């Protein structure tokens, strides 16, 4: 069974590298890139969450709950040509990058769901 996704981190396919790739269409805007050795260098105080929750290609079941994420992040790293890059992302793009970034540190989205209050609201939802 093939499932569609919008991001994939190297550890999800058994590759022990700090890299991930994303292809996300948000309205008329398309974000498509791969990044090596990414680092979140700054983030907003404002948080957000996906109202419908998050899913993951590594998790074959639905996990209910809100995952707190930063509304805006600045991500630095190296592109596929070996050039340094810095991306300023907000909203859904920022959420997806944080999800993939977590995989690099062995963190799953459900690890961030508050077990005592799984549907806690963090700022405004997306």
Write out the residue ranges for each language-model feature.
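Positively charged
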Residues: 1-126
């Amino acid at each position: 069974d093939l499932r569609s996704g919008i991001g994939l981190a190297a550890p999800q396919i058994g590759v022990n590298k700090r890299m991930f790739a994303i292809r996300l269409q948000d309205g008329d805007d398309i974000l498509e890139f791969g990044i090596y050795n990414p680092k979140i260098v700054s983030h907003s105080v404002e948080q957000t969450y996906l109202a419908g929750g998050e899913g993951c290609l590594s998790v074959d079941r639905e996990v209910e709950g809100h995952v707190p994420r930063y509304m805006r992040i600045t991500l630095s790293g190296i592109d596929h040509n070996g050039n340094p890059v810095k991306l300023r992302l907000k909203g859904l793009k920022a959420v997806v990058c944080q999800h993939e970034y977590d995989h690099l540190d062995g963190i799953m989205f459900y690890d961030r769901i508050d077990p005592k209050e799984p549907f806690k609201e963090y700022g405004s939802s997306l």
